[in-house]
Amino acid sequence: MAAYSLTIKPSAMKELQVVLDKSTLSRLIEKIQLLATQPRPSGSEQLAGRSNLYRIRQGSYRVIYSVDDQLRVVDVVKVGHRRDVYR
C-alpha cells in the first residue's frame, strides 16, 4: 500500500506546541506520523455530519484530520484537549 502525503495546518502546529506534557506530545506526534501509512487506524472515528473528517485520541487530546483518498493526502486540521477541540 502506497503512503499518503501528510500535511499539518499551521494552526494545528501551533496547537501542538501548547501541549506541555512531553510524553503526550511525543505520542501525539507518533500517531500523526502513522497517519501517512494508515489514515484510518484502529480507534479512529469519522466525525458525525462530516464526510471527510476523522479523529484519533491520545489520552485527553484529540487530533482532527481529513483524508483525500484520490489525492492520497492526510491533512491534520486541529489538535487539542477534548474539551476544546470540537468547538
What are these regions (language model features)?
Residues 1-58, 69-75, 84-87:
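Basic, Lys/Arg-enriched alpha-helical interface segments
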Residues 66:
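Conserved Hanks-type protein kinase catalytic core
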Residues 80:
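Residues forming the ATP-binding cleft of Hanks-type serine/threonine protein kinase domains
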